[in-house]
From Swiss-Prot:
Keywords: DNA replication, DNA-binding. InterPro entries: DNA_clamp_sf, Pr_cel_nuc_antig, Pr_cel_nuc_antig_N. Belongs to the PCNA family. Sliding clamp subunit that acts as a moving platform for DNA processing. Responsible for tethering the catalytic subunit of DNA polymerase and other proteins to DNA during high-speed replication. PANTHER family: PROLIFERATING CELL NUCLEAR ANTIGEN. It holds the Pfam family PCNA_N. GO terms for molecular function: DNA binding; DNA polymerase processivity factor activity. This is DNA polymerase sliding clamp. It comes from Methanoculleus marisnigri (strain ATCC 35101 / DSM 1498 / JR1). GO terms for biological process: leading strand elongation; regulation of DNA replication.
Length: 247
């Protein structure tokens, strides 16, 4: 069972965070939250999202699992206006989800959860380096790197006390180093890994809205991004596998 009302912008933010990586997901409902964890089709990136009941204007749910077509949901939320209140109602007998807002009422068929990949287990990886970065600064650096390369290195230089982002093209080079004055926080542990710009561009557009993003790094290890949504009543985590650097 699910019956909830939420601000349209909060729901849009949540769907956008998931849509950055996947087109469908298993959405788990509980008495106090909804959550999902999904991996992209190439097994390169993972998204986890939790939205607490306090993010909603009203919320009533029991434990359950829904198969959501995220691509379809993204098209629907494009119709929602600022200030709209969205009501979500699970029609159990029809296995449909009803979305009502601004005079519209959509009834969408849910996907069979058995056709959707099971929730992945988060890898137990030690990522000792940590930088807390303003979301817009992170996104701007990703966009700047995309101009000259299809990959970007993220790292921490403990000697210089900086978190840096660096890209190398055929003839061009760009580097942005953020010091302690420009960061929210820094754990100065040597770290550096190379990542695909394509994945980061999609994540970056979502992270740009966050006041701060926690970035966890190692050496040639995945990167983990963690940030709040819904005024602190929700949380998103991205995990991205590294690209192997050629010698």
């Amino acid at each position: 069972m699910l019956k909830a009302t939420i601000d349209a912008e909060i729901f849009r933010e949540s769907i956008d965070a998931i849509a950055a990586l996947v087109t469908e997901c298993r959405l788990h409902t509980a008495e106090d939250q909804i959550r999902t964890r999904s991996v992209d089709t190439a097994n390169v990136a993972m998204v986890s999202l939790e939205l607490q009941s306090t993010a909603f204007n009203s919320f009533s749910a029991t434990a359950g699992e829904l198969g959501l077509d995220i691509a379809k949901m993204k098209n629907i939320i494009g119709m929602m206006g600022k200030g709209d209140a969205l009501t979500l109602t699970l029609l159990d007998e029809e296995r449909k989800l009803e979305l009502s807002f601004g005079g519209y009422r959509y009834s969408i068929s849910l996907l069979d959860v058995n056709t959707i990949r099971k929730d992945p287990n988060p890898p137990g990886i030690d990522l000792p380096g940590k930088a807390v970065v303003p979301g817009d600064a992170l996104n701007n650096a990703i966009k700047a790197a995309a101009v000259i390369s299809d990959k970007i290195a993220l790292g921490i230089d403990p000697d210089a006390m900086t978190f840096y982002m660096e890209a190398e093209g055929d003839t061009d080079h760009i580097k942005l180093a953020l010091g302690e004055d420009e960061l929210v926080a820094l754990s100065p542990v040597q770290a550096r890994s190379l990542f695909s710009i394509d994945y980061l561009k999609d994540m970056g557009r979502v992270m740009a809205r966050a006041d701060k993003v926690e970035v966890y790094l190692g050496i040639d290890h995945p990167v983990r991004f963690v940030f709040d949504i819904a005024d602190g009543n929700g949380r998103v985590e991205y995990l991205l596998a590294p690209r192997i650097e050629a010698d």
